[in-house]
A protein has these predicted regions:
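HhH-family (HhH-GPD) DNA N-glycosylase catalytic core used in base-excision repair
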Residues: 1-259
C-alpha cells in the first residue's frame, strides 16, 4: 500500500512527533521513518505539506494513519489554550507541529515499564531486543522486521530471556504484568471509555499480593493513559519534567516531593 496525505493548513511535524520520547520503535532510514505498527511495517516521509506513506498491509489507509498520528486533533486550538506566557510560547515555537501518537495500549504499557530509569537509546535497544526474540517476523522490501509480542507471548517467556534483552530488574515486572494482562485481570481495551480517575485507580491498584500491574507507578500510568487510552488530562511527570516545572513554575509544587 502506498499513498499520500495532504496536510495543507494542518500543523504537523513528523520528526518532532516521533523523536520526543513518547514512542520508541521508529527509526530513520535515509529520508524515511520506519516502524512496525501492530502487525504491519509502515514507512513515513514528510515533504512540506505532503506525508508519504508506504506499508506492508493493504489495510493501512488514510484513516489508520490519521488516527495513529492524531492528525484530526485541533492542534491550533489546543496550542492557543496553553499559550499563556513566554515560557509556553517559546516551547510551542520550538516544537511546532508536535502531536501525540495513538499507540497500542499493551505495547505502550510494556514500553514504559521498560523505560523506567533508562535513557531513550537504552529503551529503544531493549524494545528492539524483545521484538527480535519474541515478536512475529515480517519481511517487507527485502528487510526483516518484527512485531511487538503480545502479552501472552511475553507471559510465557522465561525471565532470563527478558533479562538477556537488557531489561535487568525490569524483567520481573514486565513478566508479572504480562501475566496479569494475558489472564484478563486488567483489560486495557476497556479502559479507553472510562474516566481518568477510574483508569488511574485501576492501573495503580494494590492487592493482597502487591501491585496488580508490577512496574506501573504514577508516571507510567499517566504515560499509558495519555499515549494510548485517550486520557488527554493525564500529565506524566518524570525527573526532567519536574525540574522544568520547578524552574519555571515553582508555585505549582508544595514541599511534598511526591506531588
Amino acid at each position: 500500500m502506498e499513498f499520500q496525505l495532504n496536510l495543507s493548513d494542518i500543523p504537523f511535524n513528523l520528526e518532532n512527533s516521533l523523536e520526543c520520547g513518547q514512542v520508541f520503535r521508529w527509526k530513520r532510514e535515509n529520508s524515511w521513518w520506519v516502524a512496525v505498527i501492530d502487525d504491519r511495517v509502515v514507512k513515513l516521509k514528510q515533504e512540506d505539506n505532503l506525508l508519504n506513506v508506504i506499508s506492508s498491509s493493504d489495510s493501512t489507509n488514510e484513516e489508520f494513519i490519521r488516527k495513529y498520528l492524531r492528525i484530526n486533533d485541533p492542534l491550533p486550538d489546543i496550542l492557543t489554550s496553553i499559550n499563556r506566557d513566554h515560557v509556553m510560547a517559546t516551547a510551542i515555537h520550538k516544537l511546532i507541529g508536535l502531536r501525540l501518537i495513538k499507540q497500542s495500549p499493551w505495547e505502550c504499557l510494556a514500553s514504559f515499564i521498560c523505560a523506567t530509569y533508562k535513557n531513550i537509546i537504552g529503551i529503544k535497544n531493549m524494545i528492539s531486543n524483545i521484538c527480535f526474540r519474541l515478536g512475529q517476523r515480517i519481511e517487507f522490501e527485502g528487510i526483516i522486521y518484527y512485531t511487538f509480542p503480545e502479552a501472552e507471548i511475553i507471559a510465557s517467556a522465561d525471565r532470563h530471556t527478558l533479562e538477556d534483552c537488557g531489561l535487568g530488574y525490569r524483567a520481573k515486572f514486565l513478566l508479572e504484568t504480562a501475566n496479569r494482562i494475558a489472564s484478563r485481570e486488567v483489560i486495557l481495551e476497556n479502559l479507553e471509555s472510562a474516566k481518568y480517575e477510574n483508569v488511574r485507580e485501576i492501573l495503580l491498584e494494590n492487592t493482597d499480593k502487591g501491585k496488580i500491574l508490577p512496574g506501573v507507578g504514577p508516571k507510567v500510568a499517566d504515560c499509558v493513559m495519555l499515549f494510548s487510552l485517550e486520557k488527554l488530562d493525564a500529565f506524566p511527570i518524570d525527573v526532567w519534567i519536574r525540574r522544568t516545572i520547578q524552574k519555571y513554575y515553582p508555585f505549582l509544587f508544595d514541599n511534598d516531593s511526591n506531588h
